[in-house]
Amino acid sequence: MSDWDLGELNALEKAQQTAALAAVNQQLESQTAEQRVAWALEHLPEQAVLSSSFGIQAAVSLRLVTRQRPDIPVILTDTGYLFPETYRFIDELTETLGLNLQIFRATTSPAWQEARYGKLWEQGVEGIERYNQLNKVEPMNRALATLGAGTWFAGLRREQSGSRAHLPVLAIQRGVFKLLPIIDWDNRQVYQYLTRHGLSYHPLWEQGYLSVGDTHTTRKCEPGMSEEETRFFGLKRECGLHEG
């Protein structure tokens, strides 16, 4: 697998582009997470960045990638509505792992948004999507542009939801290469990695949370609920960051 140029890839016919990505993904599927990170850092364009929601398993990807690129910018899109435990977890991991944390927020404050639009998360799917566009998608797009990102690492896993079940290791999203090093990991592998390296789950894991986002759209997992139903009142699984 040689160096990849996004411009050259985008210049290909759609069928050729799809075939090229499929060929490299076939090889990446057989590699370990560490090997995927190493390959991406060697062959994909700079600037490499890593996004994190600092959720339940966040420490895995943060350690995995920063072990090979200690100063990689770590992008957090802060909505202003994260749990207090999340903010403390961010501080803890930033200090423990020496993260180069880059925080991006909406251009309008949470209070001003509520004054202007009301509580968007209580306005059905349309309101949730508008909220996510303002507080997650636009700040992420701005982060990628500001940092000059060419390669984007993220910690998604196929096991997490139906919407992620068929994601490839490598794709093109928002005009950059996107690599998912632990896409094929299961919960057991996450646990083993955290234990082996003395890292912790998000503090709310012990209280029954399987997925953690904003305080107003995250629920503790109850008997009979799927992980997908604990976010956005079960109306959506994705916040928009990893779509499109």
UniProtKB/Swiss-Prot annotation:
GO cellular component: cytoplasm
Entries under Pfam families matching the protein: PAPS_reduct
Keyword Nuclease: no
Keyword Nucleus: no
GO MF entry, a single one: phosphoadenylyl-sulfate reductase (thioredoxin) activity
Family to which this protein belongs: Belongs to the PAPS reductase family. CysH subfamily.
PANTHER family: PHOSPHOADENOSINE PHOSPHOSULFATE REDUCTASE (PTHR46509:SF1)
UniProt-recorded name of the protein: Phosphoadenosine 5'-phosphosulfate reductase
Taxonomy of the source species: Bacteria, Pseudomonadati, Pseudomonadota, Gammaproteobacteria, Enterobacterales
